[in-house]
């Protein structure tokens, strides 16, 4: 786990008010900012900090962006949609979800209807 700290008291005066990221898994300290001696991004062993007192500094990470995820749930049988293609007059109220919107199946073009059927009913995930 990584923790941010600002050193408020230390045996080594060069550490006073410096800001560090402590990685407890690697036992490493990464300097974020220091007045002297230490440089930004310098990595040292946590034990090299010696005796110190500190206050926690909140660390904010950017959200992970995984890309769009979308699920349309239509509770229908394949045969129902295929019959609606062949006999649209029997299904004037048949409504489905497409890209988050409710749409009447009969208002779609034949190409869109085939696409909905192909994407809705698959053999495996």
UniProtKB/Swiss-Prot annotation:
GO terms for molecular function: formate C-acetyltransferase activity. PROSITE patterns: GLY_RADICAL_1, GLY_RADICAL_2. Gene3D superfamilies: 3.20.70.20. Keywords: Organic radical. It comes from the Bacteria. The keyword Isomerase does not apply. SUPFAM superfamilies: PFL-like glycyl radical enzymes (SSF51998). Residues 5-125 form the Glycine radical domain. The modification Glycine radical is found at residue 100. Pfam families: Gly_radical (PF01228). GO terms for cellular component: cytosol. HAMAP family: GrcA. Acts as a radical domain for damaged PFL and possibly other radical proteins. This is Autonomous glycyl radical cofactor.
